[in-house]
Amino acid sequence: MLSGRLVLGLVSMAGRVCLCQGSAGSGAIGPVEAAIRTKLEEALSPEVLELRNESGGHAVPPGSETHFRVAVVSSRFEGLSPLQRHRLVHAALAEELGGPVHALAIQARTPAQWRENSQLDTSPPCLGGNKKTLGTP
């Protein structure tokens, strides 16, 4: 289930659904987020595309577009392993992953898998780039 805070926009076109939070929770969609959305729509023709800019939860300046979580539901994923699905997403976003995007969490599902579970996973809290993880000396 998506929270009201997460879903600030809902667009439905020709049976496709796009849910978005907006840039770092501000409600505005930045250029990197817009490029990610456009490229995934063009490459995968998703039935559902949920994109969340999680940069605000990390040690980056306000308004950054560096950390994203995406759920892509596409019939293009039928018969593919999770690794193959992720490779398709990475190929579509090669420019962004080679530049401004530092982290991308991907949920790539078939339409049948999404009908069974339409929950968007949550990310763990940021430990910061210079902080040690628990249990690490």
UniProtKB/Swiss-Prot annotation:
Residues 114-137 are annotated as: Disordered. Keywords: Mitochondrion, Phosphoprotein. The keyword Mitochondrion applies. GO terms for cellular component: iron-sulfur cluster assembly complex; mitochondrion. Its main location: mitochondrion. GO terms for biological process: cell redox homeostasis; intracellular iron ion homeostasis; iron-sulfur cluster assembly. It is found in: Mitochondrion. Widely expressed. The modification Phosphoserine is found at residue 81. It comes from the Eukaryota. Pfam families: BolA. Disulfide bonds: none annotated. Coiled coil: none annotated. Gene3D superfamilies: BolA-like (3.30.300.90). Belongs to the BolA/IbaG family. Acts as a mitochondrial iron-sulfur (Fe-S) cluster assembly factor that facilitates (Fe-S) cluster insertion into a subset of mitochondrial proteins. Probably acts together with the monothiol glutaredoxin GLRX5. May protect cells against oxidative stress. Interacts with GLRX5. This is BolA-like protein 1. It comes from Homo sapiens (Human).
